[in-house]
């Protein structure tokens, strides 16, 4: 029985979701201790991290779009079996940097494979394991890419170098997901300074998951 909770962090490149995640972890760790599990996709264990290197390697320019989508799904399956599911069975709070919505947005819309096709593929890969809460860090695609150029030159990967039109398609898909799943996906204004982004995200988490996240991000604990 899965008694824990899965919170996923989503957003276009340069939205700052990973920085926000790290700041949130710093606030929640004293409160939750071992009940908090932090992971990422693709990755989260040895096999999935190996797949991550293949996917994001800038030299793998010959990779077919469907191959890319299948690799993400394969990494996700291993991640669930080896990392996420055991944590949820242990009543832990799992914070995951990207999940299914990323595949729908990036491969389904960005690559043009089809959002429904990618969703269906991932339903098979995940056996229907859905996030309890998704924080969508929203920022304009052009702003996000500019942030990457300014602050992440040494970390630019194969998807970061796609044309702006690709990233606009990704952002549009995220907004459709937000509209289609309002109970699960909550928008965070990622154009704000980081401390305000973190505050807004923690307020959402506290309202949705009070068993794990105290009001004011656990600062009163």
UniProtKB/Swiss-Prot annotation:
GO terms for molecular function: ATP binding; dTMP kinase activity. Gene3D superfamilies: P-loop containing nucleotide triphosphate hydrolases. The keyword Kinase applies. Its EC number is 2.7.4.9. One of its GO terms (cellular component) is cytosol. SUPFAM superfamilies: P-loop containing nucleoside triphosphate hydrolases. It comes from the Bacteria. One of its GO terms (biological process) is dUDP biosynthetic process. It is an enzyme of class 2 (transferase). Keywords: ATP-binding, Kinase, Nucleotide biosynthesis, Nucleotide-binding, Transferase. ATP binds at residues 11-18. InterPro entries: P-loop_NTPase (IPR027417), Thymidylate_kin-like_dom (IPR039430), Thymidylate_kin_CS (IPR018095), Thymidylate_kinase (IPR018094). It catalyses: dTMP + ATP = dTDP + ADP. Pfam families: Thymidylate_kin. Phosphorylation of dTMP to form dTDP in both de novo and salvage pathways of dTTP synthesis. Belongs to the thymidylate kinase family. This is Thymidylate kinase. It comes from Lactiplantibacillus plantarum (strain ATCC BAA-793 / NCIMB 8826 / WCFS1) (Lactobacillus plantarum).
